[in-house]
Amino acid sequence: MPSQEIFKTKQRKSTNRRRKKRRTAESESDSDSSSSSAASDIEMTNEEEKNDNNSPIISDVELSDLENESEKRDVYELDKETKNKLANIPLTRTEFTSRKDKSVPINLNAVQNKLEMSEEQLKDRIATDQSKEQDAYLNLMFENFGDELNAFRTASDFNSKTVNILANVLKDGTALFDNETLKSIVKSQI
């Protein structure tokens, strides 16, 4: 019961405050006397100070948000000359970007399939390039260390397992280098 009474009294106080604020606002607008004009002058200066204080305050905006907005604007503000230059670059043209009928929507499944196929082709091309470089490296190793390998073959403990182990060691030797280093090693010996 006491909590309900407290709640009611708080409600009354808040309504009284609202009424008082309204009354003071009405009385300020109704009175035009000299004493009220001095008070209104003080209020005007206070309001001007508040406005002055508000103007230099900048809201909390992250720089990344502003950069993203400017990037979005830059993307959409390409002129015709830039578009023509980009159209002449082969990597920026696809059958989807150079289609004539823009009213027909792009089939996203076809785009995804095309991307997957091109990704597989790229992986295959990289794998074949790497295997060619590895083969060239192995040939280089055999040229430089062929006599030692022949000495291994004539040894009494040499068998078929030894050939597999030796071949795997030589293949794994190519993994010591990254692609660029392996290319430079192979090219320097040619």
Curated annotation (Swiss-Prot):
GO terms for cellular component: nucleolus; preribosome, large subunit precursor. Transmembrane segments: none annotated. Required for efficient biogenesis of the 60S ribosomal subunit. Keywords: Nucleus, Ribonucleoprotein, Ribosome biogenesis. Residues 1-72 are annotated as: Disordered. It is found in: Nucleus, Nucleolus. The keyword Manganese does not apply. The keyword Iron does not apply. It comes from Candida glabrata (strain ATCC 2001 / BCRC 20586 / JCM 3761 / NBRC 0622 / NRRL Y-65 / CBS 138) (Yeast). Residues 32-41 have a biased composition (Low complexity). Residues 9-23 have a biased composition (Basic residues). GO terms for biological process: ribosomal large subunit assembly. InterPro entries: Ribosome_Assembly_3, Rsa3_C. Associates with nucleolar pre-ribosomal particles. Its main location: nucleus. Belongs to the RSA3 family. This is Ribosome assembly protein 3. Pfam families: Rsa3.
